[in-house]
Amino acid sequence: MARKIPLHRVRNIGIAAHIDAGKTTTTERILFYTGVSHKIGEVHEGAATMDWMEQEQERGITITSAATTCHWNHPKTNEQLQVNIIDTPGHVDFTIEVERSMRVLDGAVAVFCSVGGVQPQSETVWRQANKYGVPRIIYVNKMDRTGANFFNVEAQVRDRLKANPVPIQVPIGAEENFRGMVDLIKMKAYTYNLDAQAGEMYKIEDIPADLEDVVAEYREKLIEAAAESSEELMEKYLEGTELTEDEIVAGLKKRCLAMEITPMVCGTSFKNKGVQPLLDAVAMYLPAPTEVADIKGETQDGDAIIVPSTDKGEVAALAFKIMTDPFVGQLTFTRVYRGVLESGTYVLNSTKMKKERIGRLLKMHANSREEIKELYAGEIGAVVGLKDTITGDTLASEKDPVILERMDFPDPVISVAVEPKTKADQEKMGIALGKLAEEDPSFRVNTDEESGQTIISGMGELHLEILVDRMKREFKVEAEVGAPQVAYRETIRNAVKQEYKYAKQSGGKGQYGHVYLEIKPLPSGSEPNFKFNNEIKGGVVPKEYIPAVEKGCAEAMLGGILAGYPMVDIEVTLYDGSYHDVDSSEMAFKLAASMGFKQGCRSAAAGAVILEPIMKVEIETPEDYMGDVIGDCNKRRGQVQSMDDRAGIKLVTAMIPLSEMFGYSTDLRSMSQGRATYSMIFDAYQEVPRNVSEEIMKKRNG
């Protein structure tokens, strides 16, 4: 079966936003206008088609990024486009989901609330989009809300996100009088009835007289932005010649794809205004797979190569999300970059070098599914029946087992102990946690060796709450949850040299390993957080024992030296040693390295310290409670970074240790009579003050 829609008519986009900016509603409307869903699902009725897990509908937030396919006609050429939408969660505990979806997107729509503007989570999502080089357009939503201000959001995008927004529309009216928008390219007004019903089209009218000045100012900025895309257009602009509509669109698209500008549109998804022009902007300014940089990959030997987006050539696809579906079992969401993925064929998981059979292939529409035979380059779909593939793995042909870029996943910052309520739950809990950990690489499960308890770790309290909740609903496992524990780390402050000789002689074959190590701190937050150098000259330690020395140090780091927390940011250099022809073994060198490493780090000269996760906390509070909020931040060992005004509300940004933030939402509520809100995000690890460090050690070491 040949491809229905050529590659240049495909758009893979994400809709990313801060929680409550109206992202799911916007996606819903897009699906409605593109003819996929017939009844509009409202989030606050808990019926949105994109949010299909029970917990999401209850909490009114989006957790899993479902991938949905819909169609829209290009406003210029009228050709049908295939738009694949990845719905990304806006809550900070789910940034891992956003990272994942950014990885497979070609473009994104950043949704901002016209009242709330740029929030801390928006900054994180924006940084991730920059990191993966994703061009985007901005949609300012909720223009009908009290306090709506399109131009404020434009200023915040410039100041807080350091971006270059270029409005291609300006709003007509605001708050309850928001009626539509002026298209600055066609220079026409699009107006809607105030109570526009779903699916209602806008009327095209002349620009209202009271907006002429604003329109002229922003039209000028827009033309200048387009003219800067090339020297010819710049010359034309400077000579005072009008640029044609096609030249403006081409200029803006070129600069949008180069991430030099971000086109801005506005609307109110809930009130059905502005969604069709938003889709037109997606079609005109966001890239097809052929217009973005080809993905980088590596061969099995580790050589870097480029994998071009094309149907020709051997298949190369990336698994970016695993989900357990109640009807079909495990779904692996996959983006094909090259070649064709066909159902019923065998491919190689080149990351693990294991063969996999592609069972069924599905295209997902929010919560219905369509079975297909092939998935072509640039397309996104779900594979049923993969056994060994997890997030971030590459599926490729055996003839050309390329590995596409790997994704980096953040380490968890918080953990809790979970105990099954009954014996019967014990086994089920093991299976459930295993499945959840497969789906979500930022969620880890391990067993505490001393207490034998199962410890789960994740990106925040909400993250773990939702996972425990899913365990109860999807796997019917009842579990008791302990108090949250902070993921402390340990490191050293100074470089030390340490010699260690491990020699045992007790009849028969002895053990002998002898190493000289230099142990140095790396800069805070280094990636990777352990570096090993071998500077052995003249074979004083034979080559085959070097990996054992590295392994000994790496394993010693896991157990820490002060309070048993994993160590980070350390570089070890093996620079001398000796061996014994008969008694030396890998085991002996591993033990020598491990004991030498611990001894070196424990020495007073190394200056070992405990590190704790510091959170960037943003609190929005009415002015009356400002004093209490700041006083409380200081009490929690916080450092207030800034205080701003936003639409009559005070905005406090502070750095506060995670260990002081448990139960904060309840305290903040009672402090402000429920009127203040906050959000927090992990910022960095910092050294713990001495008195706190002693308490931690006392608790851990008894």
Swiss-Prot record:
Keyword GTP-binding in annotation: yes
One GO cellular component, as annotated: cytoplasm
Gene3D superfamilies: 3.30.230.10, 3.30.70.240, Elongation Factor G (Translational Gtpase), domain 3, P-loop containing nucleotide triphosphate hydrolases, Translation factors
UniProt: GTP binding residues: 17-24, 87-91, 141-144
Domain tr-type G, residue spans: 8-290
UniProt superkingdom: Bacteria
A GO molecular function held by the record: translation elongation factor activity
Subcellular location: Cytoplasm
InterPro entries named among the record's database cross-references: EFG_II (IPR041095), EFG_III (IPR009022), EFG_III/V (IPR035647), EFG_IV (IPR047872), EFG_V (IPR035649), EFG_V-like (IPR000640), EFTu-like_2 (IPR004161), G_TR_CS (IPR031157)
Keyword Nucleotide-binding: yes
Family matches, as Pfam families: EFG_C, EFG_III, EFG_IV, GTP_EFTU, GTP_EFTU_D2
GO biological process: ribosome disassembly
Keywords: Cytoplasm, Elongation factor, GTP-binding, Nucleotide-binding, Protein biosynthesis
NCBIfam families: EF-G, PRK12740.1-3, PRK12740.1-5, small_GTP
Biological role: Catalyzes the GTP-dependent ribosomal translocation step during translation elongation. During this step, the ribosome changes from the pre-translocational (PRE) to the post-translocational (POST) state as the newly formed A-site-bound peptidyl-tRNA and P-site-bound deacylated tRNA move to the P and E sites, respectively. Catalyzes the coordinated movement of the two tRNA molecules, the mRNA and conformational changes in the ribosome.
Family: Belongs to the TRAFAC class translation factor GTPase superfamily. Classic translation factor GTPase family. EF-G/EF-2 subfamily.
Protein name according to UniProt: Elongation factor G
Organism: Aliarcobacter butzleri (strain RM4018)
